Amino acid sequence: MLVVVNARFLTQKVTGVQRFAMEICLQLKTMLKEVEFVTPSDVIQKEAYQELNAKIIGSHHGHLWELLDLPKYLKSKGKPLLVNLANSGPLFYKNKIVTIHDVAYKVFPQTYPKSFLLYYNLMIPRLLNGSRHVVTVSQYSKEEICKFYHVSKDKVSVVYNAVSDSFKPLRQSVDAAYFLAVSSMNYRKNFIYILEAFCKYQEQGGKEYLYIIGDLKNASFKKIDLSKYTYNPKIKFLGRVSDEDLIKYYSNAVAFVYPSFYEGFGIPPLEAQTCGCPAICAEASCLPEVFGDSVLYCDPYECDSLVSSFQEIASDKTFRNSLIEKGYINTGKYSWKKSAKQLRDIIESLV
């Protein structure tokens, strides 16, 4: 029986949500007997589009495509099961699975535009109530969805994220030891906390550098004064980098730093672990669930906690090596193939 996948994510820049959707679809393509991937015409993820042999339908774009073109196409196909993987879907089409990755907009509404909040607060309850089944990416997110939207726990399944096979250790000699962070100015990512803690670590004798990956041209960076950090010779803002370079930076860092207040899953620390890099994570949201005892935890509200974490992981080689080994074990728990099989089983139970 035909299954249709909403592949509008092919028209979007890649974040964790789009990565999940693409990787799951590449696996589902080989697991389902009859599956179509459909998308609007404004595709930017050309390689994935070709690999999935996706089909362009309709004349609209964005949410309007989901509201008008996609349901019309599904009706012409006999109303098959529709799989939505990226936080959205047609509101009034009932025979669907919807994936909601987190409800950060409920927990930190002050960090989102009012137009975004208005739309999501109208859309998400209708998506949840109008779907046959709901998927999310951690037990923590499942609990959050059920709490905020009063959805039955039996209706929600957890399908974990994983890491691309391209992520693996790539050791190289480096000019100086460094900690690594991937920057975002969203409040819940707690980026300024990293800078403040690192400067304090420096004052207490820390010798390492801090490398920060991210686009400083992003409008969100203009909201704060970064001057006292950009002129620090030990803090290097690297801008956006390719996956190949990201793997090199992960593989040769003293540790990866991820003190986020709130995540649905947390892919970057898992990428770091896959590359043999120990991770420092906030003891918050889903991170203890996903990483167990394989990372060093810090209190995301206490700067001194991260300072101590910098000191411990930089000074204790035995401890650092133990985190690397635990990281490898932890990454073995997650694979796109395993996650896609879980989703396939859900799909097959509904068709």
What residue ranges belong to the model's regions?
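Carbohydrate transferase catalytic cores enriched for Leloir-type hexosyltransferases
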Residues: 1-351
